[in-house]
């Protein structure tokens, strides 16, 4: 897909009837698109993960031994260049990022040399409200909970976040990626270069919903992100709310 994208972008630019003087910025060309690789990482294991408790905005850290758990992912990402790094502002994600992309790599340019990681509240897990910290067994006899299990788009946890609000903040995050990606290429550059990579350290529900929003045929349960697991998505941005994506094998 990377080669096809580069070839298509090259053809679109070379075949433009405009002269060099008349060429316009990318964002004024309605037929163009912008490409990137998203690397979506779920945080490492917490106590509540181990106890199978709902954990939304509660701010728990990782269990002891997280460095060992995340070592394979750290080795996978070592030396990869990221144009941007985004991270949920909750502790479990911040600690995960510190392990998989150590500060020494950031300052040395091993993984990122131009920008510090951005802490992003829009990448938080769904807020479960009063159900945060509870297990299925604690809630299974609550009628509202059972209704929420069947129709989370219609039911909101008490004191929690509606599904609409959850989806909207993720859509706004994707739109901000589009705006940043367009701004990268106000003038044509090397159209055969690989698309930039963006690292996103976030939560299982966020990864599921982003894949559901981006990839045709995916629903919320198509993925089951494990703690410390990464998913790579080749993403084409054709405009606000207009995305084409493909999950890469891993």
Model-identified regions with their sequence ranges:
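Active-site-proximal alpha-helix that buttresses catalytic centers in soluble enzyme cores
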Residues: 13-17, 21, 36, 45-109
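Short glycine-rich phosphate-binding loop at a beta-alpha junction
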Residues: 82-89, 185-192, 197-201
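Short active-site segment of divalent metal-dependent hydrolases/proteases
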Residues: 46, 206-207
